[in-house]
């Protein structure tokens, strides 16, 4: 989809270049020009040109080159009917050199139009494609950035590949968070990754015809294999790396192979890497040498046929890893690069799946939005589809994954919610306050001993500090009682969510009531209808998570 003004203003050189290049890759192209003004019913354009008379899509993917955004309800309905991904091809108002040098990429002012609004319409993979080049003094021409066009074409091709390749032939990497290296910490924010979510995903993939090998898919087998052979190892434990190589079945990337892949990266990235970490052969993290002294990067994997389970690599040395995980400037070590380059060039992944909130890839150094090959997230994800199950209530960091990691977000539920209730000490205190008031009404003098005991317990529990009380009096004892009631009524998450599994009936009801309790503007039948709808949505959420995951793997 292209703005009609580019045709009327003779700004179509970049369109010709793009069409020729995509046709050379074996694709048919249907360029459609439409008005960029509001109120021109773009949904009719989609219906007319991209959906056949029998309601089937005529295209595998839709590329929007800086045109309209489909945020109106009627437009979004048509996009859902079309049922193919819409890629956000970004046209910048700056020139190529300024964009390449920019530390921001797309400034805040333009980010809302070029990135945020398309996100609301469901567009994915925001890709800088076109810039304005100055010609003579007063003429500016839109030009396609050559290397960005290749990446964009690769993304379109790989989406089409997911749509057409048989599931049994697809190779998928399931990537989970393992920090710190050498420890048994495998998980994500409020998500039961190991073994439950991985089990749920593998079982569904086997049902969908993916080659998951002949191994049993059960909780114990997954847990034991991942804990034995699917964890990162710190640089301080070379013996553990040797043990993994000899007893497990890791991927060994020869140093010379890594160098071939490494040389495909930009000069800027290679210079930064070697300034921080030295040359590849100087690496120590997750490096193993055979009896002849040949060096390999070790990548832990657990293989299930064409599916691999693998931990996201360490962000940096353990002694300062905490400061590195969100550091905007420090590049990742060589093994981190070897990992993602292997997934692209060695494993030939049809898709990557980053399981749970959140990993480190989208936080690597580079532009804030509108990334290019000098930016680590873009340089490592390249054109490989990135599917990312992500907790639904963490919108801000999910946007980071979309904009910097090219992620297609699959929202998953939070853990179930219920009333927090009180711990035994607070419960006894609340009971003691009630007994005190009862005794005070009968015998004020005999209740004084109870009051002194309550004051001691309140100070021991620190409630006076919570409420910033200098002294505890009979009057503010009521404030403490109200505070305990507030704590008791608070909603809190219970346990972890398992991707693809709805809460049981009791937790579904409790979570429904937690949500309904925050709805202050509904009453009577409206409130009951809202309660019923929420409960139905929670009950079917598990299946819908897996359905959305499979649609993403199908390029939909």
Language model features with spans:
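Ligand/cofactor-recognition surfaces for anionic moieties
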Residues: 1-556
